[in-house]
Curated annotation (Swiss-Prot):
This is E3 ubiquitin-protein ligase DTX1. InterPro entries: Deltex_C, Deltex_C_sf, Deltex_fam, WWE-dom_subgr, WWE_dom, WWE_dom_sf, Znf_RING, Znf_RING/FYVE/PHD. Its main location: cytoplasm. It catalyses: S-ubiquitinyl-[E2 ubiquitin-conjugating enzyme]-L-cysteine + [acceptor protein]-L-lysine = [E2 ubiquitin-conjugating enzyme]-L-cysteine + N(6)-ubiquitinyl-[acceptor protein]-L-lysine. A zinc finger (RING-type) spans 418-479. Its EC number is 2.3.2.27. It comes from Mus musculus (Mouse). It is found in: Cytoplasm; Nucleus. Regulator of Notch signaling, a signaling pathway involved in cell-cell communications that regulates a broad spectrum of cell-fate determinations. Mainly acts as a positive regulator of Notch, but it also acts as a negative regulator, depending on the developmental and cell context. Mediates the antineural activity of Notch, possibly by inhibiting the transcriptional activation mediated by MATCH1. Involved in neurogenesis, lymphogenesis and myogenesis, and may also be involved in MZB (Marginal zone B) cell differentiation. Pathway: Protein modification; protein ubiquitination. It comes from the Eukaryota. Residues 230-248, 275-287 have a biased composition (Pro residues). Residues 222-254, 269-327, 368-398 are annotated as: Disordered.
Length: 627
């Protein structure tokens, strides 16, 4: 359901808050490493719902309905997706939408990536595009959802407002997502949040949370003091005042609305799109979103309030008591970052507070220049460089031999589920008839040596055959690794040395700088598309560690992970959408030297412990090296 007002409608989380006893469309989604919820296909969602009806605490084998998802299993009890060949776990959620929305009609909107493949939009974006399409809007601005893209329906294209690059998009019909009727458990009600765990500690979330708490307290105080009186309907807002091209040189003040109806954030107009100007009846141009919808807030906050922004000089002082909110991209050619400006501005304006948006400091990505004579080896770490060449294909290891090496045969298995095929251990494997293997009988059951978890031998053979086939095995239940796990990282070079500068939070220590360099090349047999070219964007990549005992320990383990080809892999970039490119492989690095504005820098008190845990999950630890 969309918010009222003219022009492009933008939903909040796909829906508002419908009654609990109406029909809803169910969409299952998984959380990627950039904290974006990505929808499973309708076919997969139907499969998950069918399993859910039979056993709400069971597991879902996604490979049974989608051959590309063979390594993946969803644990319905913990609400996590587990990748069997790498051990990667990601939160999943069960989201709900109106049956008349895009997923209820089986409509999918997709954009074309650099490799010519079509990638589906996130579900909230898909619904937003479909709403605008049904209302016959000629264009749509996605800035309110945090994306700097314009959608043009006449040319069926998407344009990046900053780079002006265009991509094709398409609308196709697919299977409608499953429909459900009945009450929704509290853990799955609108709007479905992120995974239940530790709250996010990034600067933006801390700012929003503190702002929300402050505004709620002030608003409660105002409500206690203010007399109750009937609210008069707000007058239609006048058009925004003209601003000089390129935007104000300094800060931007957003004054509180005269009513509690809502607030809008106006910024300097940017260069308009190349498409024809919108006809009468389309919403007025918002300077923060060229040729697009006004930046929305939440619920009915889509209309601009009576307030206007006032540009002030960069040297003008901020009035006492007005909080300064750092905003990214607040410059002459870029918009106010909608995720930050919209959220905090609405919270403060709704509470009757003025808001001053200031320029955010730029991240310090690199240290000051360092001469060659100042670069020193890292104490206790031999050498300054490691190179990896093309994978030397070892003599092919028979999958049955690998599985039998780590398994002990169980003559009388318990009447429990095999968590790979979800059949009972006392019956034949679910891969009987799917995997042809004469040497392994489908009813054979084995127990892994260290952890003791039991599976059908045929199921483990199938799991191993779908992985990297490097002679190692990973328990799907506890993720214990048997053997030495290796990855699919392409050839490259890793350098490491000391530089005479300190990281924030480590004032008394020098810094370990790691430089990764991987050139463009051709994919090998272990990669997604053998024989096809892969790209390597952003290399050389510079990463930083403190030169203390724990930092050097992390470096030694990163060297081991590099030699086992676990640092990078070839896949699809979640930031650019480019396929067949080199991407990070679940081991986080700090690439911001002198600040932590992007979340990839220092200070970060928990980073070293977190990366040690990530390395352990990949089978790289000092204990495993000694074993």
């Amino acid at each position: 359901m969309s918010r009222p007002g003219q022009g492009v409608m933008v939903p909040v989380n796909g829906l508002g808050f419908p009654p609990q006893n109406v029909a809803r469309v169910v969409v299952w989604e998984w959380l990627n490493e950039h904290s974006r919820w990505r929808p499973y296909t309708a076919t997969v969602c139907h499969h998950i719902e069918n399993v859910l009806k039979e056993d709400a605490r069971g597991s879902v084998v996604l490979g049974q309905v989608d051959a590309q998802l063979v390594p993946y299993i969803i644990d319905l009890q913990s609400m996590h997706q587990f990748r069997q060949d790498t051990g990667t776990m990601r939160p999943v959620r069960r989201n709900f939408y109106d049956p008349s929305s895009a997923p209820g009609k089986g409509i999918v909107w997709e954009w074309e990536n650099d490799g010519g493949a079509w990638t589906a939009y996130d579900m909230d974006i898909c619904i937003t595009i479909q709403n605008a399409y049904e209302k016959q809007h000629p264009w749509l601005d996605l800035s309110s959802l945090g994306f700097c893209y314009l959608i043009y329906f006449n040319s069926m294209s998407q344009m990046n407002r900053q780079t002006r690059r265009r991509r094709r998009l398409r609308r196709r019909l697919d299977l409608a997502y499953p429909l459900t009727v009945g009450s929704i458990p509290k853990s799955q009600s609108w709007p479905v949040g992120a995974s239940s765990g530790q709250p996010c500690s990034c600067q933006q979330c801390l700012l929003v949370n503190s702002t929300r708490a402050a505004s709620n307290a002030i608003l409660a105080s105002q409500r206690r003091k203010a007399p109750i009186a009937p609210a008069a309907p707000p007058a239609p807002p006048p058009p925004p005042p003209p601003l000089p091209p390129g935007g104000p040189p300094g800060a931007l003040v957003v004054r509180p609305s005269a009513t509690f109806a809502g607030a809008a954030l106006w910024a300097a107009p940017a260069t308009g799109p190349t498409e024809p100007a919108p006809p009468p009846g389309v919403p007025p141009r918002s300077p923060s979103a060229p040729n697009g919808a006004p930046t929305p807030g939440q619920n009915n906050l889509s209309r601009p309030g009576p307030q206007r922004s006032t540009s002030v000089s960069a040297r003008a002082s901020i009035p006492p008591g007005v909080p300064a909110l750092p905003v990214k991209n607040l410059n002459g050619t870029g918009p106010v970052h909608p995720a930050l400006a919209g959220m905090t501005g609405i919270l403060l304006c709704a509470a009757g507070l003025p808001v001053c948006l200031t320029r955010a400091p730029k991240p310090i990505l690199h240290p000051p220049p360092v001469s060659k004579s100042d670069v020193k080896p890292v104490p206790g770490v031999p050498g300054v460089c490691r190179k990896t060449k093309k994978k030397h294909l070892k003599k092919s290891k028979n999958p049955e031999d690998v599985v039998r090496r780590y398994m002990q045969k169980v003559k009388n298995p318990p009447d429990e589920d095999c968590t790979i095929c979800m059949e009972r251990l006392v019956t034949a494997s679910g891969y009987e008839g799917v995997l042809r293997n004469k040497s392994v009988r489908p009813e054979l059951v084995g127990r892994l040596g260290r952890c003791g978890h039991m599976y059908h031998l045929l199921c483990l053979v199938a799991m191993y055959s779908n992985g990297n086939k490097d002679g190692s095995l990973q328990c799907p239940t506890c993720k214990a690794i048997y053997g030495e796990k290796t990855g699919t990282q392409p050839p490259g070079k890793m350098e490491f040395h000391l530089i005479p500068h300190s990281l924030p939070g480590f004032a008394d220590t020098q810094t370990i700088r790691i430089v990764y360099d991987i050139p463009t090349g051709i994919q090998g047999p272990e990669h997604p598309n053998p024989g096809k070219k892969f790209t390597a964007r952003g290399f050389p990549r510079h990463c930083y560690l403190p030169n203390n005992e724990k930092g050097r320990k992390v470096l030694r383990l990163l060297i081991t992970a590099w030699e086992r080809r676990l640092i990078f892999t070839i896949g699809t970039s979640n930031t650019t959408g480019e396929s067949d490119t080199v991407v990070w492989n679940e081991i986080h690095h700090k690439t911001e030297f002198g600040s932590n504005l992007t979340g990839h820098g220092y200070p970060d008190a928990s980073y070293l412990d977190n990366v040690l845990a990530e390395l352990t999950a990949q089978g790289v630890s000092e204990a495993m090296a000694k074993a």
